[in-house]
Amino acid sequence: MPVEYDPKTGLINLHNDQISYVIQILAHRYPVHRYFGRYFSKQPYFEPMPSGSHAFANDPTERFPYSVTSLPLEYSTIGSGDYRQPAYVIKDANNQLLPILEYTGFSVNDQPINSRQLPPTVSKHTPVTTLVIHLTDAVTKLQMDLNYTIFENQPLILRSTTLRHHGTTNLQVTALSSAQLDLPTDQYTALTLSGTHAHEANPSFNRLHPGLQTVRSLRGTSGPQHQPFMALAEPNTTELAGTVIGCALAWSGNFDSTVEVDQYQHSRLTIGLEPDTFEWQLKPNSSFQTPEAVLTWTNTGFNGMSQVFHDFSYQLMPSQTNIPSVLNTWETLTFAVSESKVQHLIEHAHQLGLQMLVLDDGWFVNRNGENGQLGDWFVDPIKFPNGLNPLAQQAHHHRMKFGLWVEPEMITTNSQLYQQHPDWVLQYVDRTPITARHQLVLDLSQAAVRDHLITTLTNLVQNNQLDYLKWDMNRHLTQVGSTHLPAAQQGELYHRYVCGLYDILTRLKRACPKLIIENCSAGGGRFDFGMLPYTNQTWISDLTDPVDRATIENGFSYLFPPRIFSNHITASPNAQNGRITPFETRLQLACIGQLGLELNPKQLAPSEQQLLRGALIKYQQLKSTFIKAHFYRLPTTRHVVAWLIVTADKKQAICCYLNGLNSRVKTQHPLPLHYLDAELAYSDSSGNRYTGHQLNTMGIPLKPTNADFTSQLIYLCQN
């Protein structure tokens, strides 16, 4: 039984055979946090909770001889004596703060939350148990459920909060986290991922200190600046070893992840909706569900944490078995696309062995630059006088797929759609609209807007025989107001926008179940666990230089398996940073993910074309074998990155490493692989034989290099 309850002590042990999460119901009143870590096979003994009698603490009462000022509460607020970061702030009809809600019981079931408006986080084949702790406010008749869904076979817990209002007056919710985790020490290093456009997912490691450390987004999306994620690692944790608590949010909008160290060197981690841009009017007989936080514990270092998040991603996402290699038109043609040019590219792609042609930006009316028209999605009759169907048919004739770039959330004022429905955009009353990239944003909270987009996109896909859409979003939200919401509910719009996006993607997938959708927001600007259930792969950055992109992949791999990264071979010198790199490096790095080409095939030398053809054949042969393989970051100071990809049975592996600047000193330094089966014997492509123990500890010999930015892919298999 994954939930054990001791009524004498009030202890609830939520567990599988890997982790335990222990809550105590203190004095039949408040749930407090007692433990999160390795599984307890027997119910542990915990020292009695201290009363917390100290300066500035609330006076204890006979019913509750404790002070909430320092209690490790499961879910708390301000105004009742707890002065730390609140998990929730709710006001009643008198504009007064609700207190810390009191325990009324718990329930257990074998179903996930999987709210219809939020991303589904548990597949129907994944066994889970959900513990629900029920809290209530007797005055307002508000019921609050703290949800804990534990996976049977993973050290993973999903946490969320559900509000159910049984009272008679409106409540105003101004902060509502998905999870709060109170820990008894401050001896942690916080890992976060930060960045910007074309420089995403840079790991930051910072020791906790007194006060607040926060990452957040105010942009309307999760954004490239910060990931909705924070990990707390014990001292001396490495990629290979050490204790880590990882916490991410399955949400694609504004978020807040904060850790606070109080005056007693206790830590509180909260993650959830960003409170400055969130309000919700909770009406009588209504409910509200937060996004889910994804919580894990491991004692096998950052790689161990990543394995849990990767496995979570795989069960979350649509199937990847049908994802084709692609030729994308963007860096070849930009906006200057035409029927004849695309026809030639389809033929070249077929000759090289690529499996799909993607027609990027510029295919629709009045779109010859960034200031062109958005919103109507009509094929440009000048560039494509015969429409897109002949191109789709040409691709399908070669057993290739055909796809388009779209930016459905955006609109320009010169579009027919805007002329007909100016009230469909996000806007403030009596204010001049603020454009970014010459664009306004559609109000996805409106049902009419969503219905229009579903009809438009479904017709676009079906009428043009499309197999794929690259769904882009190239600006963030401003003037987040709606003509269709009353003044008292305008604070709900950031949240309603994201739920509207999920609704559109859900309905589009239902209407076009075989459609491949690539997630993009000027690269990795909306890459989160909220988008994964709706999309097959992600364009992680607009920076295509293999050296910088490898570091971006390395950062994102803390959370996501690189198999879902869309990686394209582009020209050298690189269009974004001017770096010159060997073709082999660009090819090999692109193979660690969903492989594509984004240059004119005529620019490739015959030898490069031959390399690409051979790589595509090998890529397809190994794809099914490695589609859910384990990915590890290998510790190295001698390479830009070093990675190991190992099948579940550890009988096959791929080692990939990327060198930086070349050195005149040609000293060989083997690379330890750490994660192979020590009892197996392996061979590489050249026939060299090694034991797994040898490769794990001594390392694999690496070839000296005579050029900058070289790389190598080494395939290993059991003898």
Curated annotation (Swiss-Prot):
Biological role: Alpha-galactosidase associated with the sucrase operon.
Gene behind this protein: agaS
Protein name from the UniProt record: Alpha-galactosidase 2
InterPro entries, A to Z: Aldolase_TIM (IPR013785), Alpga-gal_N_sf (IPR038417), Alpha-glycosidase_related (IPR050985), Glyco_hydro_27/36_CS (IPR000111), Glyco_hydro_36 (IPR002252), Glyco_hydro_36_C (IPR031705), Glyco_hydro_36_N (IPR031704), Glyco_hydro_b (IPR013780)
Xref: CDD domains: GH36 (cd14791)
PROSITE patterns, per database record: ALPHA_GALACTOSIDASE
GO molecular function terms listed in the Swiss-Prot or TrEMBL record: alpha-galactosidase activity
Family (UniProt): Belongs to the glycosyl hydrolase 36 family.
Any Pfam family matching the protein: Glyco_hydro_36N
Keyword entries, A-Z: Glycosidase, Hydrolase
EC number: 3.2.1.22
Phylogenetic placement of the source organism: Bacteria, Bacillati, Bacillota, Bacilli, Lactobacillales
Catalytic activity: Hydrolysis of terminal, non-reducing alpha-D-galactose residues in alpha-D-galactosides, including galactose oligosaccharides, galactomannans and galactolipids
Active-site residue list: 472 (nucleophile), 542 (proton donor)
GO biological process: carbohydrate catabolic process
Gene3D superfamilies assigned: Aldolase class I, alpha-galactosidase from lactobacil brevis, Golgi alpha-mannosidase II
